[in-house]
Amino acid sequence: MIIGLGSDLMDIRRIEKSIERFGDRFIQRVFTEIEQAKSDKRRMRAASYAKRFAAKEAGAKALGTGIARGVSWKEIGVVNLPSGKPTLEFKGRALERALALTPHGHEPFAHITITDDHPWAQAFVVLEARPIGHHFDGLAHG
């Protein structure tokens, strides 16, 4: 069952300017180590970060909190399943919120899609409650 839905549209130029202005301080404050390792290898580095930024925002909207209301940037991270498909990893208060939305006997899983077409990056998140024991290949608890 669907327990949350979120979307976000991000201007890649905004991320480019933040990286130029604040450098590693911005990147380390907003992005997980996994996201940094993935994005820093990309030719279109700012676009990669912008997609992840949009996914974090969309994930926070799917949780019903937004980033400012109790969930921090690094508590939502874009990770890839063994198949390469992206999903979200929730930690801390984001994980607590995901679990609070999830009915008894179920576990949360985030379906996401991210894309970019300069100057835009976009993300959609569908947060699903899956019955426990269903093939679980996504949301890591940590």
Swiss-Prot record:
Location in the cell: Cytoplasm
Cofactor: Mg(2+)
Amino acids binding Mg(2+): 8, 57
EC number(s) reported in the record: 2.7.8.7
Protein name stated in the entry: Holo-[acyl-carrier-protein] synthase
Upper classification of the organism: Bacteria, Pseudomonadati, Pseudomonadota, Alphaproteobacteria, Maricaulales
Reaction equations catalysed: apo-[ACP] + CoA = holo-[ACP] + adenosine 3',5'-bisphosphate + H(+)
Keyword terms: Cytoplasm, Fatty acid biosynthesis, Fatty acid metabolism, Lipid biosynthesis, Lipid metabolism, Magnesium, Metal-binding, Transferase
Function, as annotated: Transfers the 4'-phosphopantetheine moiety from coenzyme A to a Ser of acyl-carrier-protein.
Molecular function terms from GO: holo-[acyl-carrier-protein] synthase activity; magnesium ion binding
Homology family: Belongs to the P-Pant transferase superfamily. AcpS family.
Keyword Metal-binding: yes
Keyword Ubl conjugation: no
GO biological process, one term: fatty acid biosynthetic process
